[in-house]
Amino acid sequence: MVKDFRANGFLFRNLIGRFLVWREEKAYRRLKGLKGTPTLYRVVDGLVLVLEHIPGMSLEDAGDKGTVPEGFFDALKMLVDAFHRRGICHCDLKRAANILVGADGRPNVLDWSAAILEREFRFFPLTGIYRRFLIDDLNAVTKYRLRHSPETVSVEALERYLGRSRLEKMIRALRDRLRELLQRVA
């Protein structure tokens, strides 16, 4: 798979595109060898990521077709725990397009451009922000469980999912507006 920013406008390509490629490359290097994440083959000119193609379908499509395998969400939770142990947080798992049901029925997490590394948030108050993003990743798994197999949601996960603070709601609204703006600029 190729993620290419060369076709974007000059400013977006050279400011946003290069930054996103740099961030995503950093994430893939941290994830190297972790089953359930694509392999980064190379970066071209700081604007193109060449990634492993993983056959399968998005979680959204699999859910619509009723083909989410039994045990998928347990495996997804284990994958999320595995990349958290490596000190990386995805930060955009709420988008179903970023989760792939592989041809083997296993979860794969794609699009690491929004990811953050624990070491980038190692000083107070940034440590609290990083912990919040960890919870966000876990809440994404709970969101999909609620949608596709609600009987598998634990009480602890449900309480965590429903316990959003006013600050989190405000940050989410700001993030969504920023995403819309960036999509218009691209």
Where are these regions (language model features)?
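Short helix/strand-bridging catalytic loops that position acidic/His residues to coordinate divalent metals
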Residues: 11-15, 63-68, 122-130
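Conserved hydrophobic/aromatic residues on the N-lobe beta-strands of protein kinase domains
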Residues: 1, 48-51
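C-lobe/activation-segment region of protein kinase-like
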Residues: 102-186
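Short beta-strand micro-motifs within the conserved protein kinase catalytic domain, predominantly
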Residues: 38-49
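ATP-binding glycine-rich loop module of kinase domains
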Residues: 1-29
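Conserved kinase catalytic-core helix
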Residues: 24-37, 52, 57-102, 106-110, ...
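Residue-level recognition of conserved beta-strand positions in structured domain cores
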Residues: 4-6, 42, 52-53, 111-112
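Conserved protein kinase catalytic core
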Residues: 9-10, 58, 98, 117
